Amino acid sequence: DNGWAFTFSGALNTGDGYIRGTNYEGWTYFGNISKKINDSHKLSLTAFGAPQWHNQRATKHYIEDYKNSPDGGRYSNGYGCLNGALTGAGYGYNYYHKPQVSLNHYWTINANSSLTTSAYASLARGGGRRVAGNKTNWLTIDYNTGRPQAGAMLTPDGLFDYDAVLKANAESEHGSQVAFTNVVNSHDWYGLLSS
């Protein structure tokens, strides 16, 4: 009405994943507000993005690990429970969000000519979990074998024992011996296009 148009949508996708310990959450959103100023000029503001996080399985395992596991091909040992939630260990978690926003101007100069101009921005933030400290072996999988590092703190069923790690960190005379960190990938893109 009065030359205005509005469109908005969004969705949430969440689940446990096919592989054990690979739970995930992903949102998507889209929004557009457009205005027809007159027969020669239109403006359109658009924003969209898809923030997500996911746990992931270690990249390598021996075939016998799959065969010997009751989970078969769904087998994973690179996670544990932290505060009641499945939590991937070092190299077992990623997150990312790269929203994009653009303001477009459409100008019909005459019957034979037009000019479209777009100003845009994209502000990306994301990263992946790592472990740091003197005892990283408590919470890491050996990249070559897919098995926990020697000295890893595990529950009786072979998952990472975060409670034991928290207890050992709290009791250490030298502060925390291992901690989760994130390797971050961020960038800001801006631009102006006209054709």
Question: Which residues does each PLM region occupy?
Answer:
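Generic hydrophobic alpha-helical segments
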Residues: 15, 112, 124, 176-179
